[in-house]
């Protein structure tokens, strides 16, 4: 799904949070221009959307987190959110970075690139018309290591299967590499 709209990541995350984590009392509201954008709760699956370097945990350890890191919120304190990030461990994310921590029950195909999940539920509809193509569908399917479920409008799926996004670009990369590789080096 795309970021905004009826069938968007934001909508799906809101619904998933209500189903999977409805009762968590500890929460932190992410505000923008005085309006609640989303609510983070203990137990939520989240995704970090911006690199943050040199986070100093209370035990003195220094940790970096990167765009696309997934985790689970373990606690919410006055000045930080404790998140258990996959492959990193527990990180005390300062609340100043909280606007870059989004719900991660549903993520965009772009955010999922480079990741693998046991089960992926992919969605295709005409709300993301401009993005519909074979490459998007391929990326979506190949994120699943065991099971892929597709929820699609039939016409949108037919359109995606017939449209290619790859643009053939004219570059001089091969010429430059050929020239570089054929140079003689004096040592």
Give the ranges of each region predicted by the language model.
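C-terminal accessory regions
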Residues: 59, 67-187
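Conserved helicase/translocase motor-coupling segment
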Residues: 1-67
């Amino acid at each position: 799904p795309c970021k905004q709209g009826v069938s968007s990541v934001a909508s799906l995350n809101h619904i998933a949070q209500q189903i999977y984590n409805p009762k968590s009392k500890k929460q932190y509201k992410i505000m923008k221009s005085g309006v609640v954008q989303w609510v983070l709760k203990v137990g939520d699956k989240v995704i970090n959307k911006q690199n943050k370097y040199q986070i100093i945990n209370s035990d003195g350890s220094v940790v970096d987190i990167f765009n696309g890191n997934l985790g689970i919120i373990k606690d919410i304190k006055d000045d930080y959110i404790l998140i258990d990030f996959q492959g990193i461990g527990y990180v005390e994310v300062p609340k100043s970075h909280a606007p870059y921590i989004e719900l991660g029950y549903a993520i965009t195909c772009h955010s999922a690139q480079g990741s693998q999940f046991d089960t992926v539920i992919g969605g295709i509809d005409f709300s993301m018309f401009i993005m519909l193509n074979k490459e998007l569908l391929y990326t979506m399917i190949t994120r699943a290591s065991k099971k892929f479920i597709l929820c699609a409008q039939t016409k949108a799926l037919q359109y995606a299967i017939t449209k290619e996004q790859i643009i053939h670009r004219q570059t001089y990369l091969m010429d430059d590499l050929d020239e570089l590789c054929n140079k003689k080096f004096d040592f």
